[in-house]
Every structure is written in C-alpha cells, then in structure tokens.
Amino acid sequence: IEPFVTDRKLFRQRLISAVDYGKSLDGIDASKIAMIGFCFGGLASIELARSGHNLSGCVSFHGLLNQSDETFNKVNTKLLVLNGDLDPMVSSEQILALQNEMTESEADWQLINYGNTYHAFTNPLANDVAMGTVYNHDSDERSWIAMTNFLEEVFGNVNK
C-alpha cells in the first residue's frame, strides 16, 4: 500500500490502466463504469476521481482521505464518500481538506459522515475499538442504501 500512498502519480496510472482495460472487454458499456472501494480501495476510488479520468461515479466506504501534495485535474466524476465520524484514520482536517478540494475542483460530490461510527463499519468481523475498527450495522445498511441510490442516479434506474 505504501508505494501507492506516497507515489500518487503511479497509483493513478495503475488505476486508469485497470479501468481502461475493463472498458475494452466485450459486453462492457464504457459509458457506465463506477468504482467502489473500501478502506485503501476507498482511497483508490477518490484518487481515480481526482485523476480527471471520466467515470460515471466513484464511491468510497471508510476510505483513507489523506491528500497528496500534487495538483489535481478538474474532477469529472461524481463522488460519494461514506465515512465514520469516529474513524481514527481520518481526521476532521482531512475531511475539511477533501471538501475544499472537491469544491475547488468543481466536482459533483457528497460526503456522509455517520455518527458514532468507526473505521471498517461495513465489515461484520471488525470488532477492535482499540484499533478503531468496529462494525456498525446501522451505518453499514445506511451506507449501502446511499450507494445504491447514488448508482441509480449516475446510471439511471436499470430496473425500469
């Protein structure tokens, strides 16, 4: 993980390569691609949005929010960030920095900060308050609903 956290250019290149490969596969509608990530994958989802690469949407569940020192492109991808307010891996300064960054990038973004919720709140096996990783049933369900609503918005209702 560390090489990608410290070298965001490399990280974005790898993410873009993976998306471009996925777009090239038979049966894939390249105009309807979203990325969903949890923890480090949540950071990856945010980083892909920051890259300026065109996706329908990116979703981050309890993702790391640490920002790199690099300047980012205009964010063209809708972004949903789902965070626990007691997550020890995300500071209030990081939340504010992300909000400012996304607003300055003219992004279409949402951030939901679930109260009394730690990191890894979607993982039923997480139960370590000392590490700050605790499953939260209500936040898990609410975040899943938020994600499905977001995906319905970016893709349209596929069940109609």
Label each PLM-derived region with a short phrase.
Residues I1-K160:
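N-terminal cap/leader regions of alpha/beta-hydrolase-fold enzymes
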